[in-house]
Amino acid sequence: MAKGIVVYYSRSGNTKEMAEIIAKAMNDAGLSTECKPIDKVHADDLPAYDAVVIGSPCYYGQMAGPVKHLVDELVSRHGQLNGKVGAAFSSSANIGGGSETTVLGILEAMLIAGMVIQGDPQGAHYGPLSVGKPDERVRQQCERRGQRVAALTKRLFP
């Protein structure tokens, strides 16, 4: 049976809230999914999942240090995530604060790892982005991303 994980780093709670919404949507869509803060996850854990979703606040247009550390740890496990489904999301303090570049940085690492990334033709093309606390629009984008990740994962790993 396919399974997923949503991994996040959050200081203010905004990224955590987004992670919980995405994980719930994945579970509700029939993909058994765990939601864990990044300090409870090691790179060795990730190959056991068929879908890996990573969330980070935006710091200077980049992923937070703990998220970058996890991504860097994947180098020694190169190929172990090949063919798995990947997705990313981010929160920031300001409009234009760099959330898209944060998400793209995570997605770039996933692509190098051989992961399957699905864009979205509606709304959050690269992944859900929040400015501050997630509002209703962001909550809907998180739900949609979780549903789409679950659907793709179940198709690839029946």
Describe the role of every protein-language-model region.
Residues 2-4, 10, 14-158:
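FMN-binding flavodoxin-like domain, especially the glycine-rich phosphate-binding loop
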